[in-house]
Amino acid sequence: MSLVQSAMFNHHMGPSHTRSRSFELFQEAKTLRVAACKRSYSDDLNISTKRARTAPPSPPYETATPTRASRLVISNLVKPTSNLRSRSLSPNKKFSSPLSPSSSPIATVTSPISSPQNIKIKLPSISDALNLPPITSKEPVKLKPIVPTVSLDYFDTYKPNDENWRYGLLDKIAKESKHFHLNQYNYLNDHAKPSFDSKLSSKIQQSSIANGKKINFPYESNYTYLNKTYLNDVKNYPEYLELAAESLLQLKERQLPPPPLQSHQKQHPPPPPHLPVQGLLPVPAPPVSHFSSSYTTPQAPTFYHPPSQQQQQTPPPQTLHHQQPQPPISTHKFIPISPPSAKKSRSDLLKSPPKHHHHHAPRVCISCGSDQSPCWRPSWSIKQGQLCNSCGLRYKKTKARCLNDKCKKIPAKGEWTLMQSKGKETFEDGIEGYSCIACGWRVEVLPKS
């Protein structure tokens, strides 16, 4: 504030005002202090004029006895050098004058000493630098291809050298060699084919298939063949039309049995038909007659028949014209066997429970009605029957069964859990219980043993 006040006083003081000696000395000390603390851009460039920090300080001007007048002249005319300013370059110790160059009394005095290093460099503004046109080259830059130098040492890995060496070698052989001829090696030429001295087979030279009968595969597709070429094949090969008929006749002949021989018939006469005895025997096959004999001779059966119920039937003779295709004649004795029973549905098996016989009664599951099981398991009652393997395992885990005679379902573990989650219901007879998931009837649950 003292510097600002002094500057303000200098402007407002008149010429008749007289200053005291102490005021002049005080003003001179402030001027030297401001000049020593002030930094400029030229001070940073003036590196060569700086003195080493280890050197002893010396006065910049050698004066014996500086007087007050000489101090004023030096301070007014000569700008102090950088040796008098602070050695510290810390930004905290910078001092900038708040006064403008026009109002400051120190800035009005220019130093007569000048050097080329004090010239300030003027840089362009940011806007001017951004508005400059981009630097573009008029001609495109042509870069040379990167070729490895190692491959140049080996002619077989470098194509230009390989071709030059190969053609040079061929020219040298053709010129210098007298007993070597390149015509013997026609494989070097792409258009030439090797010639063989060995004889070819006559079957290969003279093909039995005419060229007109072949289908030109690369130039003829299925579409063009169906439109044009197949008519020529039909004309050239009429046997193709007869092939289908011949194949049908052959198949028909294979299905028909061969005609029986007369000697074979005499040696093995056909068995006679028999009537069933007391409903236990099945109905026999119809009688077989032959044109060679007018009647059949009965053959003794392997089982006993009452003489009153055993009858013989003599069929009328048939001529050859009315003979129908006959099955092959069996050479073994006629033994009637009970035909296999047809597989019944589950409802039929449940309606008709199996009859207990004293010999080999077939087993049927009383729950699902199946007669096929690897093993049989006990049910809830020995009198009613047994369970198959799957039903027996389910009943062993759940101990639950449907009481409906038409259902008799044994729920699986997941089905039984679903029945229990629905809860018990009250039925018409007033008994509470779980309902069957299949038919809705009451399910009987036995305690697990």
UniProtKB/Swiss-Prot annotation:
The keyword Magnesium does not apply. A zinc finger (GATA-type) spans 365-391. Component of the RPD3C(L) histone deacetylase complex (HDAC). Responsible for the deacetylation of lysine residues on the N-terminal part of the core histones (H2A, H2B, H3 and H4). Histone deacetylation gives a tag for epigenetic repression and plays an important role in transcriptional regulation, cell cycle progression and developmental events. Controls filamentous growth and required for full virulence in a mouse model of disseminated candidiasis. GO terms for biological process: cellular response to starvation; chromatin organization; filamentous growth; filamentous growth of a population of unicellular organisms; filamentous growth of a population of unicellular organisms in response to biotic stimulus; filamentous growth of a population of unicellular organisms in response to neutral pH; filamentous growth of a population of unicellular organisms in response to starvation; negative regulation of transcription by RNA polymerase II. SUPFAM superfamilies: Glucocorticoid receptor-like (DNA-binding domain) (SSF57716). It is found in: Nucleus. The lineage of its organism: Eukaryota, Fungi, Dikarya, Ascomycota, Saccharomycotina. Residues 48-67, 83-111, 256-361 are annotated as: Disordered. Signal peptide: none annotated. Residues 88-105, 305-324 have a biased composition (Low complexity). InterPro entries: Znf_GATA, Znf_NHR/GATA. This is Transcriptional regulatory protein ASH1. Residues 290-300 have a biased composition (Polar residues). The ASH1 mRNA is transported to the daughter cell before cytokinesis where translation produces the protein to block mating-type switching, as well as to the hyphal tips during filamentous growth. Component of the RPD3C(L) complex. It comes from Candida albicans (strain SC5314 / ATCC MYA-2876) (Yeast). Its main location: nucleus. Disruption phenotype: Leads to defects in responding to some filament-inducing conditions and to reduced virulence. PROSITE patterns: GATA_ZN_FINGER_2. One of its GO terms (molecular function) is zinc ion binding. GO terms for cellular component: nucleus. Keywords: Chromatin regulator, DNA-binding, Metal-binding, Nucleus, Repressor, Transcription, Transcription regulation, Virulence, Zinc, Zinc-finger. Induction: Expression is controlled by the transcription factor ACE2.
